[in-house]
Amino acid sequence: MYLIFTEDDGWHTNQLTKAFELYNKEVATVKINEASIVVNENSKIIVEGKQISLKDIDGAFVRGIPGGTLEEICFHLDILHFLELHKVKVYNNAVCIEKSVDKVRTSCILNANNIPTPNTYITSNIKDLMHLKSKFFDESCVCKPIFGSQGKGLEILNKNNIHPDYENLNNVYYLQEFLEHP
């Protein structure tokens, strides 16, 4: 059996499901926030009330993990770690998600590997926010929440908009050099 962790049955989930069915493989789509784990000598995952032995899982594909509290997010990642610790192959595993979901960590990894990115400055000190903006950016900079994707919460800070949406940023200010399209 293969598990597909997803928040919705989008095109990617449908394509994966069809591919598994083409090879006569059993597949279950799972909302990770509806999964539970049993940690004992007979460790299992519980999906929609059904206990599944980890020995019966051939692999798991992660297509989405919802936001939530720190505890909820950590638990969702713990489920993926749990599967891998029990020799279940997880595609788009917890380590990959941890490296890519946090813009600060991603920026640090890119920098450590000499992959060029726009100049970036991060602070949780509100006093440093405007100082950083005025010191390091001539005209405009991009202010982003450290979690999120697809441009959600992104703001251009410039002479006309000097204050970001503070509530959206949760007290961490990720400022990045604004690069014009060529």
PLM regions: where:
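Glycine-rich phosphate-binding loop of ATP-grasp-fold ATP-dependent ligases
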Residues: 119-122, 140-163
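Flexible loop residues that form catalytic
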Residues: 65, 125, 146
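Extreme N-terminal starter segment of soluble prokaryotic enzymes
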Residues: 1-3
